[in-house]
Design a protein with these regions (language model features):
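Extracytosolic ligand-binding ectodomains
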Residues: 2-15, 31-408
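Bacterial N-terminal signal peptides
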Residues: 19-24
């Protein structure tokens, strides 16, 4: 997912070694590092915003990753052991790149990140150059993986073959949302309020409109705003109301969404609201009356109220450790680590291999026809050489102040 300027991209903290270990640092920078350097462990790095406006996303991915790392290392007969280090990028692209360089100096061999889009796009340029395997839990822009055509059919960013996503791409969120609204007959007249200054929001909107047209789903009005005009949504809501919209699609983040819900309540306007992954987090937004989010729907790959054993165990561990209910970002991050672990086992890579060799073998493994993964955010997950994940989204609705599965 992208945050404002396209969430989803992790950044890594820079650790500068003392002069006595410069030679070892140079080996790591070249993709080296021996088994003795790593103590038999693969070095996994994580980057995200752990402070600042997007911290809710970064901390969720950090927590989910940590739980997975702890589980892997606790396996008595496990052949894979992991060393894990996080870095705060404050949702800033430049800081994210600096974080990556620092983690690289630490000896990072695989990157699980970054969390938000703009920083992730910046970091992928570095990992692609270094041929380091990168799996992001939540950076959803197609610019993260590259090789995707834009709305005009032009490919402006070449495919970065080392980068993969656990989350849905922005276009896929738009397509899936239109299909879900149509199939479930959630609304007959749809209004869209989107952020015209945000690639994340625009990308979802374009695909939503295209799919809605194919399905015969009526979009009666499209109301844009920008980051500079995101404090009052009276105009947009009045336009939706005048157009007779009985459902408003919100391909935006939870901060502006909270203002839209508050203003709609003031106006006495009560359409259904349907969001995307950026909406996840609205229930923990400080100062927001969560009763206003009652009935809000969104698509997500994860439901904390699911009854399968894996989800119940994860939710229980997360609540005990972090005193909070995990969201999809935490679940996606957990799955990232477990996918990496499974790919390491299947590929036969070892911690003493060079970064580039590890990357090539993991790419070949994760894209092979016989590689599938069952996790918190889906079963039978696969990855193609485009870097995109194939898995089914779940419909969620906010009920009594909690996310509840609509498909249970």
């Amino acid at each position: 997912m992208g945050f404002n300027d396209s969430l989803s991209r992790r950044n890594f903290v820079k650790l500068i070694g003392a002069s006595s270990v410069i030679s070892a640092g140079m080996l790591v920078g070249c993709g080296g590092g021996s088994d003795s350097d790593n103590d038999g462990k693969f070095k996994i790095g994580g980057i995200g915003p752990f402070t600042g406006a997007a911290a809710i996303y970064g901390n969720a991915t950090k927590n989910g990753t940590q739980i997975a790392v702890d589980e892997v290392n606790a396996e008595k007969d496990g052949k894979v052991k992991l060393a894990f280090k996080n870095a705060d990028d404050e949702h800033d692209a430049e800081k994210s790149v600096n974080a990556y360089k620092s983690l690289k100096d630490w000896g990072m061999q695989i990157l699980v990140g970054t969390t938000t889009t703009a920083p992730c796009v910046a970091v992928t340029a570095q990992t692609n150059q270094d041929n380091m395997f990168q799996l992001t839990p939540s950076a959803s822009s197609t610019d993260v993986i590259g090789g995707q055509a834009d709305a005009d059919g032009n490919v402006t960013t070449q495919r970065k073959k080392n980068v993969f996503q656990m989350c849905f791409t922005d276009p896929n969120q738009g397509t899936a949302s239109a299909k879900y609204i149509s199939k479930q007959k959630l609304g007959s007249k749809v209004g869209i309020i989107y952020n015209n200054s945000d690639a994340y929001s625009k990308g979802i909107t374009v695909k939503f409109k295209a799919e809605a047209k194919e399905l015969g789903l009526s979009v009666v009005t499209e109301q844009p705003f920008t980051d500079d005009s995101s404090s009052d949504f009276t105009v947009q809501l009045n336009k939706c109301k005048s157009a007779g919209a009985d459902l408003i699609f919100l391909p935006i983040y939870y901060q502006p969404a909270s203002l839209i819900l508050s203003k709609a309540n003031e106006m006495g306007y009560k359409p259904k609201f349907f969001g995307v992954d950026g909406m996840d987090g609205i229930l923990t937004l400080e100062g927001f009356d969560t009763s206003l989010a009652e009935g809000v729907m969104l698509l997500t790959p994860f439901s904390a109220d699911a009854t399968d054993d894996l989800t119940k165990k994860f939710v229980s561990t997360y609540k005990e450790k972090y005193k909070d209910t995990p969201n999809q970002f935490a679940a996606d991050a957990y799955d990232c680590v477990m996918v990496v672990k499974q790919a390491i086992e299947k590929s036969g890579v070892t911690p003493d291999m060079e970064v580039s060799e590890i990357c090539d073998k993991l790419i070949a493994t994760i894209t092979s026809s016989d590689f599938t993964y069952d996790g918190l955010t889906g079963t039978g997950m696969t990855w193609s050489d485009t870097g995109e994940v194939s898995k089914e989204p779940k419909g969620m609705v906010i009920k009594d102040g909690a996310y509840v599965g609509m498909d249970n």
